[in-house]
A protein has these predicted regions:
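Single conserved hydrophobic/aromatic residue that forms the stacking wall/gate
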Residues: 1-6, 10
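Basic- and aromatic-lined ligand-binding clefts that recognize polyanionic substrates
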Residues: 3-4, 47-79
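Short N-terminal or domain-adjacent regulatory/targeting segments
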Residues: 23-55, 68-70, 134-135
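Gly/Ser/Thr-rich loops at beta-strand to alpha-helix junctions
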Residues: 65-70, 157-163
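Redox- and metal-dependent alpha/beta enzyme cores, enriched for Fe-S-associated oxidoreductases
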Residues: 67-130, 134-137
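A short, acidic, amphipathic alpha-helical segment used as a generic capping/interface helix at domain edges
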Residues: 130-146, 163-164
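Acidic beta-strand-to-loop metal/phosphate-binding motif
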Residues: 147-156
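Peripheral docking tails and interdomain loops at the edges
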Residues: 166-192
C-alpha cells in the first residue's frame, strides 16, 4: 500500500488503494488477504513492465482531512479524473488505519494492553489538541511520497477539521508545499 506513491510508475489509482483499505473495515479477513496478495503481485508485474495507471510527470497529491465514509469518494475521483494521482492520504479511513502497528512483544496481559493503548494514543486525529504532531506527520508524508501538493478536505459539519485546516495550511506553506483547502458535503452537486 505504502509503495503505491513511490517511484515514477503509479501502480494503482489512489481510489483503488483507498477502497482496499476501507474493505479491511468490513471484509472477511482470509478473502481480503488473498485479494490483497493478488493486487500486490499485479503491482509488481506493472513495475517490472514499466506500466502504470498514470503517465510519468502526473501531479502527485496527498489527501488529508475529513475521513471519507463509504461511498463518499468524490474528491479522489475529481483529482484523478482531472489528471492527478492521489499518492497517499492522511485520514482515519486511510493510512491512519494501519500506521503505527501494535507492538506484539508484550509478555503479560498488562504489557499487551499497554501496547494497544500506546498504538491508539499515537493517532493524530483533529479531535486532539495540541496537535502539532499531525502537522509534522502530514508534511513528512508529503515529502516521503514526493507530493506536488496537499489537498485538505473538510465536510461542512466537521468543525474540528475545518478549524485545523489553518494549521495544516501553515505547516504546508512553511514546508514549501502547495496547499488547497476544500469544504464540501455528501451531496453530488459539487462533483462536476
Amino acid at each position: 500500500y505504502a509503495s503505491r506513491g513511490l517511484g515514477d510508475v503509479y501502480k494503482r489509482q489512489g481510489l483503488d488503494s483507498l477502497l482496499t483499505v476501507q474493505a479491511a473495515f468490513m471484509d472477511d479477513t482470509p478473502r481480503l488477504t488473498g485479494a490483497i496478495n493478488e493486487m500486490a503481485a499485479e503491482c509488481e508485474q506493472r513495475v517490472e513492465a514499466g506500466e502504470g495507471v498514470a503517465p510519468k510527470g502526473t501531479k502527485r497529491i496527498l489527501y488529508t482531512g475529513t475521513p471519507m465514509a463509504v461511498p463518499n469518494w468524490k474528491l479522489f475521483n475529481l483529482i484523478e479524473k482531472a489528471g492527478g494521482v492521489v499518492v497517499g492520504e492522511e485520514s482515519c479511513t486511510g493510512s491512519r488505519y494501519y500506521k503505527d502497528l501494535v507492538d506484539e512483544s508484550g509478555e503479560t496481559v498488562d504489557e499487551m494492553l499497554d501496547a494497544i493503548a500506546e498504538r491508539y494514543f499515537k493517532i493524530n486525529c483533529a479531535v486532539f489538541t495540541p496537535n502539532n504532531q499531525r502537522m509534522k506527520d502530514i508534511v513528512q508524508m508529503a515529502k516521503d511520497l514526493h507530493a506536488d501538493g496537499i489537498v485538505d478536505v473538510a465536510l461542512q459539519f466537521c468543525t474540528l477539521y475545518e478549524m485545523e485546516s489553518f494549521a495544516v495550511e501553515k505547516a504546508a506553506e512553511e514546508a514549501g508545499i502547495p496547499f488547497m483547502h476544500i469544504t464540501t458535503d455528501y451531496a453530488g452537486e459539487d462533483a462536476g
